[in-house]
């Protein structure tokens, strides 16, 4: 839309075309009331839910994304974008923790029965101590580490929870708060755990993503490209001419890299809020945002020639708390869709063997192929040797028996994402309870995984609905449940909003619909 150096005016400007920005735009398009525009510095929509393709044809998401949903409106929107049965694969989550050479079913704390006897004893000891202490505790845990100790005890804390969470967050659990936990961490039932140990049984199926969907083609990014296509081209500015250089909150003007200026009445911002306040040049808010912490994410992909090994089987994602590999999670990405890697007839050269040695031949050969996607966190408290990370990760795959030294690696991928995880730090709420209202007082709704910085509502469905609900707040003053009451939305099926019913409702009521008079 539009050429350089122009001036545009809209009622609502949406910055960012990841899930949150697209949620806002989708709702604005559905309401068909206020004028609006969505902008993004990337040519391709999707944000942190995008997908890259290697030169050899292997797909890798920006980390481990799967579709499970708490909202019918979200389901409606992605089903509209990808409406056919063959657009999707549905999977049972098959997930394990690697511990002392064993594959322990996830969640670890519910499957102590799989551990060596001495670890079982330490885990049960700790759980009993924790259960007894919890009975007399009259204060809430001060931090995530204290929560772990109170709910699981020292055995599980030392075996899994402390080392694993440090690998994920790149911050010790002592420095994290625990209000974010909700459905994110399974609390063990001591009686059930002991019962499973005696009967040598495992427990599984816990959590919101015990089953999930994955797109057949184009990875997770394909979902958001398809959602963006349901929006009119005239209201999208993606790429260089969608790159924000300045936000003047007082004048309600946003300047873009090509010189274009957009005047707005209300702004839905989904870029990282620390970047937003820098673009605003507001020293007070910049200083406030400095107490928001985040970790960076390295995504590493390894494409391998050969049939998927039996030891890998139909595993989905795997957790690695130990220090024999740099990654905290591995996803068998080729299990999600047969189109996440080149087809069998595609001829590729072997780039290296698993042990790093050169192949005996550079001849192009057929598949089949399978792939692994790895995630490594980085922060000032957990630095990463970036130069050797790919090599160290492949060695980690050998150390954990995921691949063999002689396996033929035909493709590798490594990309660093500066803003990977918004850390639920001890300081977080103190910042957000001042920063987000201060922005809203200036008619800026900052929302999204990093726009509002709340990890507990940072999945794709949550992120999308943060945008939808921001628009409803702007247009009719509706309460934003996802932002303000995460436990409430996570504990129910949210069916109040629907795409089709809503569209008819808006069409019927449009003549009499009241839109915020400032719009």
Language model: regions and residue ranges:
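C-terminal segments that line or cap access tunnels to active or ligand-binding sites in enzymes
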Residues: 264-266, 270-445, 452-456, 461-466, ...
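Active-site/ligand-binding neighborhood in enzyme catalytic cores
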Residues: 112-113, 120-252, 270
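Glycine-rich FAD pyrophosphate-binding loop
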Residues: 29-55
């Amino acid at each position: 839309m539009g050429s350089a150096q122009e001036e545009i005016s809209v009622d609502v400007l949406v910055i960012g075309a990841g899930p949150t920005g697209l949620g806002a735009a989708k709702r604005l398009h559905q309401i068909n009331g206020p004028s609006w525009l969505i902008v993004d510095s990337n040519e391709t929509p999707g944000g942190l839910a995008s997908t890259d393709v290697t030169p050899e044809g292997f797909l890798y998401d920006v980390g481990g994304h799967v579709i499970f949903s708490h909202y019918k409106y979200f389901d409606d929107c992605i089903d509209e974008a990808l409406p056919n049965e063959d657009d999707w694969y549905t999977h049972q989550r098959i997930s394990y923790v690697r511990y002392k050479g064993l594959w322990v079913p996830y969640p670890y704390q519910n499957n102590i029965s799989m551990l060596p006897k001495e670890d079982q004893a330490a885990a049960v000891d700790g759980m009993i101590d924790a259960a007894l202490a919890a009975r007399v505790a009259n204060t809430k845990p001060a931090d995530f580490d204290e929560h772990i100790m109170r709910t699981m005890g020292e055995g599980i804390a030392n075996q899994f929870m402390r080392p694993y969470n440090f690998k994920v967050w790149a911050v010790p659990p002592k420095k994290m708060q625990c209000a974010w936990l909700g459905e994110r961490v399974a609390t063990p039932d001591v009686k059930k755990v002991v019962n499973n140990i005696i009967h040598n049984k495992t427990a599984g199926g816990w959590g919101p993503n015990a089953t999930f969907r994955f797109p057949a083609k184009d990875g997770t990014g394909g979902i958001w490209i398809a959602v963006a296509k349901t929006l009119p081209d005239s209201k999208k500015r993606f790429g260089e001419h969608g790159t924000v250089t300045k936000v003047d909150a007082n004048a309600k003007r946003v300047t873009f890299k090509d010189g274009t200026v957009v005047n707005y009445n209300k702004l839905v911002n989904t870029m990282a809020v620390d970047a937003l306040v820098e673009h605003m040049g507001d020293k007070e808010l910049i200083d406030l945002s400095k107490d928001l912490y985040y970790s960076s994410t390295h995504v590493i992909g390894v494409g391998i020639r050969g049939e998927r090994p039996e030891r890998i089987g139909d595993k989905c994602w795997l957790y690695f708390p130990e220090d024999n590999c740099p990654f905290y999670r591995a996803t068998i990405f080729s299990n999600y869709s047969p189109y996440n890697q080149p087809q069998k007839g595609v001829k590729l050269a072997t780039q290296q063997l698993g042990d790093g040695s050169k192949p005996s031949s550079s001849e192009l050969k057929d598949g089949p192929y399978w792939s692994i996607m790895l995630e490594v966190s980085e922060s000032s408290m957990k630095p990463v040797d970036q130069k050797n990370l790919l090599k160290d990760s492949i060695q980690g795959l050998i150390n954990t028996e995921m691949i063999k030294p002689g396996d033929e690696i035909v493709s590798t991928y490594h990309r660093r994402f500066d803003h990977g995880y918004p850390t639920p730090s001890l300081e977080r709420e103190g910042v957000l309870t001042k920063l987000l209202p201060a922005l809203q007082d200036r008619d800026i709704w900052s929302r999204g995984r990093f726009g509002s910085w709340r990890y507990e509502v940072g999945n794709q469905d949550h992120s999308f609905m943060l945008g939808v609900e921001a628009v409803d707040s702007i247009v009719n003053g509706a309460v934003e449940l996802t932002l303000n009451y995460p436990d409430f939305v996570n504990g129910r099926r949210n069916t109040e909003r629907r795409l089709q019913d809503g569209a008819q409702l808006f069409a019927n009521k449009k003549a009499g619909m009241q839109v915020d008079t400032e719009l």
